[in-house]
Amino acid sequence: MPDYLVTLESAWIIKDVKSMDDAVSIAISEAGKRLNPSAKFVEIEAGMIACPFCEGELNTALVVAATALVGLVLQMKVFRAESEEHAARIAKSVVGKALHDVPLKVQEVQEL
């Protein structure tokens, strides 16, 4: 059975924030705190998207009225999964249990 690298997308809402950089830092910190005891092997990064006009990379954070929506990318290695779908289900289950009410979406599954 092969090993997989599963990439998940998550959305975090941060209140009372002053800047986009603060919002991203707080979101990564909060995700790390929730994942640390049970799923400390999950890598957390700020999400990036491609600009449709200049094709440069943009941060996936938006701050309006001191409230931010931050997109994070979570990566987890899943060992000995039966298929890509099985690896995605395992990753969503492990990360979902630690993060509770945070929406998750499978972005990519790569065989290692």
Curated annotation (Swiss-Prot):
| Signal peptide boundaries | none
- Check the record and name the InterPro entries matching this protein: UPF0212 (IPR007564)
Family statement: Belongs to the UPF0212 family.
Q: Which NCBIfam families match?
A: PRK03922.1 (NF003035)
This protein is called UPF0212 protein Memar_0858
Organism this protein belongs to: Methanoculleus marisnigri (strain ATCC 35101 / DSM 1498 / JR1)
